[in-house]
Amino acid sequence: MSVFQNATFYTTVNELRDLPPPVGVEIAFAGRSNAGKSSAINTLANRNRLAFVSKTPGRTQHLNFFRLGNDRFLVDLPGYGYAKVPAEVRQHWERLLGTYLQTRQSLHGMVLIMDARHPLTPLDRQMLAWFAPTKKAVHVLLTKSDKLTRQQGQKVLKTVLGFLRESYPQCSVQLFSSTSREGVKEAAALLDAWFGSGIEPDSGMIREAGAPESGKGNAPEPPNARNKKPPVKGE
């Protein structure tokens, strides 16, 4: 059974001082507002309302921690790209997200949610470039794949895979749909492996998704990546 089936809400964080102790394993979920991040979390956990789903962008306001048992945590980050945010709020989130994502010792990887109909937006690319210096794994979920034909889905997958292989070899990618459940089993198996649950993902899926072979996961640092700010609300 996937570790996601044990997910329960743990805590919400709006200040660095409120972060739980950095023990165990954390995987962060990030993505543009309304890309389907909350739906993906709920689908993986087989819950209807573990993460709040809204048609209104920007509803996730804090770092929401969900405990999966045995010091394993899923961390739901605020969606980026939502314009209706005051400057002071945006600056606060730049500090909070920047410090968390780049210095958190217990953070083992990030799941980056992209709408399969609109992948690799400028903010998505910014997030990839900004996170790359950590040398930590990134798995891209191309959500809402049910909105595409099979041919369209494969074309999008090929395009994103080509981009990642060239620039971010520590990344893997797959199609995903909370509606049709395409890719749910594969995503759960990969993330179970990240959590060290002993459940191994299908190796064929991982190679096709563009994950690096063992020992080849360190991406070159993009130019000026350390000087970039994380994409947050209002950008």
Curated annotation (Swiss-Prot):
Segments of skewed composition (Basic residues): 226-235
Keyword match Nucleotide-binding: yes
Keyword Cell division: yes
The name this protein goes by in its record: Probable GTP-binding protein EngB
Family from the record: Belongs to the TRAFAC class TrmE-Era-EngA-EngB-Septin-like GTPase superfamily. EngB GTPase family.
One of the GO BP terms on file: division septum assembly
Role played: Necessary for normal cell division and for the maintenance of normal septation.
Annotated TM spans: none
Cofactors, names only: Mg(2+)
Pfam families: MMR_HSR1
Positions of Mg(2+) binding: S38, T60
Organism: Nitrosospira multiformis (strain ATCC 25196 / NCIMB 11849 / C 71)
Residues that, per the record, bind GTP: 31-38, 58-62, 76-79, 143-146, 176-178
One GO CC annotation: cytosol
GO molecular function: GTP binding; metal ion binding
Stretches assigned to the EngB-type G domain: 23-197
Span list, region Disordered: 202-235
UniProt keyword list: Cell cycle, Cell division, GTP-binding, Magnesium, Metal-binding, Nucleotide-binding, Septation
